[in-house]
């Protein structure tokens, strides 16, 4: 069946459609209330060509399209959910994908518990009487730490289970409900104080400033510096505004600014009339994106995660076609009326103005991506690699085998997205296969990047491409390796040159699955130095985790040799303290509380002998 005949035979039902180019590469994913009507709207049929009323970006996409697939679903809402999920997983060439994939932390309290404790979450927590505060773009941990220092609440669920007062009670930072020293009713008064403090960021900052001043006066500079960092973390979430929202309303605000081929989405969160947090996403597009599609994508991506919805109004800077329908979708998802509105009052217009000013600042501060653009041209990449994931493995004679992934995005290493893995593979090839496969399996939760950079040669490049193709994602891949001297790859500068392996579609090689080419660049070449920097960071991170893993393993083996410390006691220690480092730091009394005096003494002697 020809392409045009396939389009004419589409069903008049809701679903998603996928366009592919002549090589079978995915170009675009869209949703439709009626597949037949929506897809036909892209074309003219006499002769068969793209419709005249398309935007430049969509016109270019349709000009490249040579085939399509579709999936029928029960409703338009189902189509929306499936479309959003597939776009994030597969990264089609012409879809808009926001760079900011993170979820935001909330502080929550489960008021159904007899002795509730504030905790941090990034998703909905099961429970009928959960109270959420946030979101926080930064400072959530700093706020929580301050609350626990000021108000004597339960600080660990394990304390309640133990039935014995812990160290926090001894220093006056817990009321010891585990020993019945406070009733649930009395305890709830302190919970109310904590809730008041969470709402009052100015009061928290006042408390912290007083503490910092006191530490400085007592020449306790390390403690003062820690408090200073906490203050900065809390303050950095603020966008200062002179807007006074007398109604003390809650709003989630989205605003978009487009400049040339760049677009910025700003999110601002207002709680009880105060701006409490903000974030932004940068969209780098090959062609100018449409503002309506950006709003739809930004709102969908933010609320597609299991994020608590603590507001009931979303304020947007511009009207767009799918606004009312999107309100219905979110209302169904969260089980309450959610309105997506444009500003009508002076105060709300001022908030949108504030958001757009911040968006322009983000655009102004964006660095030129010269090296990234040059890499795209040099290796004929599908997309400019704004986000790059770099992989390496590390082991010592097959022991403590680990893998590492580091991430480069928006002109810097994004350490919050770094990941390390314990690997089972016996050789470097199988280790890399395991590492890349495990990363690919998480594309649904953590969308793929523009480029994978692998530490290795042809075999690793072939392997990476095989795994990428199995997912259907649009990701470019490069491999970097040292030439071998005396059968060994030398990382030290001057001993050997780095080779870059890439897929060259113009190269015709019958004996291989892929047309793999290699390139040696001058040591002074900025493009090579950039790739080396990425590879070296992945190597550093892998080595660091390998050493830590080996130390931990060695410590565990040695500690088990201590008389009287078996696996059961080891498990008990780890469950209580959380890590070997914490066991090592624990005091004699803390160890004695978990085990007994004899074991505590043996463990302290063991760690003393390690120094």
From Swiss-Prot:
Name of this chain's protein: UvrABC system protein C
Family: Belongs to the UvrC family.
Residue ranges of every copy of the UVR domain listed in the record: 202-237
PANTHER family the UniProt entry points to: UVRABC SYSTEM PROTEIN C, UVRC/OXIDOREDUCTASE
Gene3D superfamilies, alphabetized: 5' to 3' exonuclease, C-terminal subdomain (1.10.150.20), GIY-YIG endonuclease (3.40.1440.10), UVR domain (4.10.860.10), UvrC, RNAse H endonuclease domain (3.30.420.340)
CDD domains on file: GIY-YIG_UvrC_Cho
Underlying gene: uvrC
Function description: The UvrABC repair system catalyzes the recognition and processing of DNA lesions. UvrC both incises the 5' and 3' sides of the lesion. The N-terminal half is responsible for the 3' incision and the C-terminal half is responsible for the 5' incision.
GO biological process: nucleotide-excision repair; SOS response
């Amino acid at each position: 069946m020809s392409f045009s005949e396939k389009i004419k035979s589409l069903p008049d039902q809701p679903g998603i459609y996928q366009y592919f180019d002549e090589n079978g590469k995915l170009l675009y994913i869209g949703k439709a209330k009626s597949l037949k009507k929506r897809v036909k709207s892209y074309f003219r049929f006499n002769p068969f060509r793209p419709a005249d009323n398309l935007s430049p970006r969509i016109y270019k996409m349709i000009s490249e399209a040579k085939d399509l697939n579709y999936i029928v679903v029960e409703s338009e809402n189902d189509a929306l959910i499936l479309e959003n999920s597939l776009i994030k997983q597969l990264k089609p060439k012409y879809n808009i994908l926001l760079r900011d994939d993170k979820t935001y932390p909330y502080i929550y309290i489960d008021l159904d518990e007899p002795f509730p404790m504030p905790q941090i979450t990034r998703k909905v927590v099961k429970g009928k009487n959960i109270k959420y505060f946030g979101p926080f773009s930064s400072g959530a941990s700093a706020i929580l730490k301050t609350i626990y220092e000021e108000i004597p609440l339960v600080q660990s669920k394990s304390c309640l289970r133990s039935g014995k007062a812990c160290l926090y009670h001894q220093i006056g930072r817990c009321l010891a409900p585990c020993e019945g020293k406070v009733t649930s009713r009395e305890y709830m008064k302190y919970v109310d104080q904590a809730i008041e403090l969470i709402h009052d960021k100015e009061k928290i900052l006042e408390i912290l400033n007083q503490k910092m001043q006191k530490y400085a006066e007592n020449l306790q500079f390390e403690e003062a510096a820690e408090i200073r960092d906490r203050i900065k973390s809390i303050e950095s979430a603020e966008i200062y505004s002179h807007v006074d929202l007398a109604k003390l309303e809650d709003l989630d605000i989205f605003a978009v600014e487009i400049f040339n081929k760049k677009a910025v989405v700003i999110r601002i969160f207002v709680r009880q009339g105060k701006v409490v947090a903000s974030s932004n996403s940068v969209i780098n597009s090959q062609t100018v994106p449409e503002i309506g599609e950006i709003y739809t994508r930004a709102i969908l991506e933010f609320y597609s995660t299991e994020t608590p919805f603590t507001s009931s109004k979303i304020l947007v800077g511009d009207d767009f076609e799918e606004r009312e329908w999107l309100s219905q979708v979110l209302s169904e998802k969260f089980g309450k009326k959610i309105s997506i509105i444009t500003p009508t009052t002076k105060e709300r217009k001022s908030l949108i103005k504030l958001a757009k000013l911040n968006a322009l600042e983000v655009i102004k501060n964006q660095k030129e991506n010269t090296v990234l653009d040059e890499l795209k041209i040099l290796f004929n990449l599908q997309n400019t690699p704004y986000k790059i994931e770099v992989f390496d493995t590390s082991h010592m004679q097959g022991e403590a085998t680990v893998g590492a992934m580091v991430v480069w995005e928006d002109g810097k290493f994004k350490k919050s997205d770094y990941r390390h893995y314990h690997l089972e593979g016996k050789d470097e090839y199988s280790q890399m296969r395991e590492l890349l496969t495990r990363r690919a399996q998480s594309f649904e939760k953590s969308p793929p990047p523009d480029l994978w950079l692998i530490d290795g040669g042809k075999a690793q490049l072939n392997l990476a491409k095989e795994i990428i193709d199995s997912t259907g994602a649009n990701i470019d891949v490069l491999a970097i390796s040292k030439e071998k001297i005396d059968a060994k790859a030398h990382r030290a500068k001057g001993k050997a040159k780095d080779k870059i392996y890439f897929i060259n579609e113009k190269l015709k090689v019958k004996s291989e699955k892929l047309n793999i080419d290699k390139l040696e660049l001058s040591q002074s070449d900025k493009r090579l130095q950039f790739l080396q920097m990425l590879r070296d960071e992945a190597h550093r991170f892998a080595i660091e985790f390998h050493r830590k893993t080996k130390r931990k393993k060695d410590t565990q083996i040695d500690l088990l040799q201590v008389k009287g410390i078996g696996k059961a006691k080891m498990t008990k220690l780890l469950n209580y303290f959380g890590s070997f480092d914490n066991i090592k730091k624990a005091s004699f009394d803390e160890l004695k509380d978990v085990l007994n005096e004899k074991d505590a003494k043996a463990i302290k002697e063991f760690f003393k002998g390690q120094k």
